[in-house]
From Swiss-Prot:
GO terms for cellular component: cytoplasm; small ribosomal subunit. Transmembrane segments: none annotated. The gene is rpsP. One of its GO terms (molecular function) is structural constituent of ribosome. It comes from the Bacteria. This is Small ribosomal subunit protein bS16.
Amino acid sequence: MAVKIRLKRMGAKKRPFYRVVVADSRYPRDGRFIEEIGTYNPLTEPSEIKIDTEKAQKWLKNGAQPTDTVRALLKKVGVIS
């Protein structure tokens, strides 16, 4: 099972809000997921990023691959260098 840490789009049209989730790479973007580890709101100034660092580190240690966007968010929060 190829596990990814990626963004799940929520919110209304033109008002995106994202959940940072751990999901099998074969599932659709907004489909089933294994665990929610945080949220990301790009509409606030500055962008609001809330990520459970312990859960994120656990999944990264277990081999989950973050997408490019999530990797940038994890660097901002300080989970990865």
